[in-house]
Amino acid sequence: MADDVDQQQTTNTVEEPLDLIRLSLDERIYVKMRNDRELRGRLHAYDQHLNMILGDVEETVTTIEIDEETYEEIYKSTKRNIPMLFVRGDGVVLVAPPLRVG
């Protein structure tokens, strides 16, 4: 019985960086990518290179344009939904686990 408790504590603890991602399997996560891309989706699989398979993904791409008259920066966001997406790990900047309330 004590072994079961120890095993459960080991599976829910974060000792290495990839443990945080392991605990987020089958949960919704936020992924910030290079080139001002952001992804929100359900994590189905990942590997040590941060290659990931995400489902029910909402991709947001932010572009900056400069107004020729006022030289002000104009931010534009484009969103699209993707049912299943393979994310190559070398473009990943940040992975945030789901918000846990409680």
Curated annotation (Swiss-Prot):
Highest taxon of source: Eukaryota
GO process terms (BP): mRNA processing; mRNA splicing, via spliceosome; P-body assembly
Main subcellular location of this protein, as a coarse class: nucleus
UniProt cross-references to InterPro entries, sorted A to Z: Lsm3, LSM_dom_sf, Sm, Sm-like_LSM3, Sm_dom_euk/arc
Domain Sm stretches: 16-101
Subcellular location: Nucleus
Pfam family, one: LSM
Gene Ontology MF terms in the entry: RNA binding; U6 snRNA 3'-end binding
Keyword Lipid metabolism among record annotations: no
GO terms for cellular component: catalytic step 2 spliceosome; cytosol; Lsm1-7-Pat1 complex; Lsm2-8 complex; nucleoplasm; nucleus; P-body; precatalytic spliceosome
PTM sites of type N-acetylalanine: A2
Swiss-Prot/TrEMBL keywords: Acetylation, mRNA processing, mRNA splicing, Nucleus, Ribonucleoprotein, RNA-binding, Spliceosome
Function text: Plays a role in pre-mRNA splicing as component of the U4/U6-U5 tri-snRNP complex that is involved in spliceosome assembly, and as component of the precatalytic spliceosome (spliceosome B complex). The heptameric LSM2-8 complex binds specifically to the 3'-terminal U-tract of U6 snRNA.
The protein's assembly and partners: Component of the precatalytic spliceosome (spliceosome B complex). Component of the U4/U6-U5 tri-snRNP complex, a building block of the precatalytic spliceosome (spliceosome B complex). The U4/U6-U5 tri-snRNP complex is composed of the U4, U6 and U5 snRNAs and at least PRPF3, PRPF4, PRPF6, PRPF8, PRPF31, SNRNP200, TXNL4A, SNRNP40, SNRPB, SNRPD1, SNRPD2, SNRPD3, SNRPE, SNRPF, SNRPG, DDX23, CD2BP2, PPIH, SNU13, EFTUD2, SART1 and USP39, plus LSM2, LSM3, LSM4, LSM5, LSM6, LSM7 and LSM8.
Homology family: Belongs to the snRNP Sm proteins family.
Stated name of the protein: U6 snRNA-associated Sm-like protein LSm3
Gene this chain is encoded by: LSM3
